[in-house]
Amino acid sequence: SSVCRRLIFRTSRPGERASSQNSFHVRYFRTSVVHRDDLVTVKTPAFAESVTEGDVRWEKAVGDSVTEDEVVCEIETDKTSVQVPSPAAGVIEELLVPDGGKVEGGTPLFKLRKGAAAEAAPSSVTEPVTAAPPPPPPPVSAPTAMPSVPPVPTQALQAKPVPAPTLPEPSTLGGRGESRVKMSRMRLRIAQRLKEAQNTCAMLTTFNEVDMSNIQEMRTLHKDAFLKKHSIKLGFMSAFVKAAAHALTDQPAVNAVIDGATNEIVYRDYVDISVAVATPKGLVVPVIRNVETMNFADIERTINALGEKARNNELAVEDMDGGTFTISNGGVFGSLFGTPIINPPQSAILGMHGIFQRPVAVDGKAEIRPMMYVALTYDHRLVDGREAVTFLRKIKAAVEDPRALLLDM
């Protein structure tokens, strides 16, 4: 605070001689220093190396109040959407990028006045409107006598019938309009990558079927104890992920990739499996890393965490980077059969389908078993048919009898 002086003039009382002592006196008072609200510029967060830019979609407008960590905008990249929160409570002062504009990491997004409050809009007070009195009811008219009907002449009775006039046809129910919606960055990137895979890879698909009887029985017997110990439900996906890791270790070519820049084959001694997850915004493929070191509980826990983040639109770009193999489960939508498309730059993808009761031959007898078709699409430039068929049979054996995993068979 600072000290100020003010000179006050005082008039003389009657009979008092004017002097410098009684004409003025000094009054001291204190003032507070005025603190202005801090204005900060919020920038685009850094992206992963595989992402260069994104499209901005604003959740707030200029003048809106925000609390700390409240989402101000969302940046849609090729792989996921990144939410940008407010670093502090305050008011949006200025938007530096238009809605739908492209930004890179570190681009200034908006200006925030910290600690400010939004101006409340003046509430307009309207005077109560007196309802108009209802109109008086119309006067009741006296009944009018109907005129007598003259007799119909004989010629009219013998007249020929006249055809009724043609009525216009009723209009067709429902419209036939069209609408155009701009492709989102994620949808556009998915389309580009799928076409890239089709144009680059020599894709071939091999099929097999899996008897799910044993894995269903194992789940029924141990699901309660599994949930009690690990606090996570036991599903079927972990069995296929673990079986895929087992088969990838046995057939390293399926886990490898072609480096087009050097014309070399890159073999990986680790297994990172991408699991396709459908979201309202499109298909995302978060990665389960080092699956070869995981047990069923670790896999189920990771799948559950990644699925929850995908449904809440909280996946980071780092969650989807990399991956040496992909599993897509169309069975959750009731798929019977299908051929998945490779997720580049990977060399193969496993497609799971629905479990249906079908008659199968067991020891020379027909039995009804829960069966699932599985499909492996692979890049024939790198993976031979023998390796692909052997790989799929490894998965079939491990799922039908999980003891094969324990015995490393």
UniProtKB/Swiss-Prot annotation:
This is Dihydrolipoyllysine-residue succinyltransferase component of 2-oxoglutarate dehydrogenase complex, mitochondrial. Residues 121-180 are annotated as: Disordered. Its cofactor is (R)-lipoate. Residues 1-36 form a transit peptide. Belongs to the 2-oxoacid dehydrogenase family. Gene3D superfamilies: 2.40.50.100, Chloramphenicol acetyltransferase-like domain. Residues 39-113 form the Lipoyl-binding domain. It comes from Takifugu rubripes (Japanese pufferfish). InterPro entries: 2-oxoA_DH_lipoyl-BS (IPR003016), 2-oxoacid_dehydrogenase (IPR050537), 2-oxoacid_DH_actylTfrase (IPR001078), Biotin_lipoyl (IPR000089), CAT-like_dom_sf (IPR023213), Single_hybrid_motif (IPR011053), SucB (IPR006255). Pathway: Amino-acid degradation; L-lysine degradation via saccharopine pathway; glutaryl-CoA from L-lysine: step 6/6. Dihydrolipoamide succinyltransferase (E2) component of the 2-oxoglutarate dehydrogenase complex. The 2-oxoglutarate dehydrogenase complex catalyzes the overall conversion of 2-oxoglutarate to succinyl-CoA and CO(2). The 2-oxoglutarate dehydrogenase complex is mainly active in the mitochondrion. A fraction of the 2-oxoglutarate dehydrogenase complex also localizes in the nucleus and is required for lysine succinylation of histones: associates with kat2a on chromatin and provides succinyl-CoA to histone succinyltransferase kat2a. It is found in: Mitochondrion matrix; Nucleus. The active site is at H380, D384. Binds 1 lipoyl cofactor covalently. It holds the Pfam family 2-oxoacid_dh. Keywords: Acyltransferase, Lipoyl, Mitochondrion, Nucleus, Transferase, Transit peptide, Tricarboxylic acid cycle. One of its GO terms (cellular component) is nucleus. Its EC number is 2.3.1.61. One of its GO terms (molecular function) is dihydrolipoyllysine-residue succinyltransferase activity. It catalyses: N(6)-[(R)-dihydrolipoyl]-L-lysyl-[protein] + succinyl-CoA = N(6)-[(R)-S(8)-succinyldihydrolipoyl]-L-lysyl-[protein] + CoA. The 2-oxoglutarate dehydrogenase complex is composed of OGDH (2-oxoglutarate dehydrogenase; E1), DLST (dihydrolipoamide succinyltransferase; E2) and DLD (dihydrolipoamide dehydrogenase; E3). It contains multiple copies of the three enzymatic components (E1, E2 and E3). In the nucleus, the 2-oxoglutarate dehydrogenase complex associates with kat2a. One of its GO terms (biological process) is 2-oxoglutarate metabolic process. The keyword Transit peptide applies. It comes from the Eukaryota.
